[in-house]
């Protein structure tokens, strides 16, 4: 990795981590579902979907992928916190909440990524 590539990666990582911190600063819980992790995962997936289309459409240099996809979205989203929350629900015998947490996080994240790609494709084609 060259110096400028590192700068792109680091800048995206710092911004993504900062936004994640701000969103997860005060835990949001609906029934037993930890919504703050869901929010960062869905937002990150949507932004990644938008970026994928922009990157393809504009033939963006790989440094922008380091910034947006790997740095920003990678630091914003959180598989480890999702896994921890799910593990805690399992350990507390909250099986319904566990199933809901998994289905909602995975389903909405995939839906958000597809939605971001679809929205950006529509905007670009018009």
UniProtKB/Swiss-Prot annotation:
Compartments where found: Cell membrane
Amino acids binding Na(+): 74, 77
Keyword Heme in record: no
S-S pairs: none
Reaction equation(s) it catalyzes: fluoride(in) = fluoride(out)
Membrane-spanning parts: 33-53, 64-84, 96-116
Membrane topology: Multi-pass membrane protein
Entry's Gene Ontology cellular component terms: plasma membrane
GO molecular function, one term: metal ion binding
Signal sequence bounds: none
Coiled coil regions, renumbered to chain: none
Documented activity regulation: Na(+) is not transported, but it plays an essential structural role and its presence is essential for fluoride channel function.
Any GO BP: cellular detoxification of fluoride
NCBIfam families, per database record: crcB
Family (UniProt): Belongs to the fluoride channel Fluc/FEX (TC 1.A.43) family.
Biological role: Fluoride-specific ion channel. Important for reducing fluoride concentration in the cell, thus reducing its toxicity.
Protein name as catalogued: Fluoride-specific ion channel FluC
Organism, as annotated: Nitrosopumilus maritimus (strain SCM1)
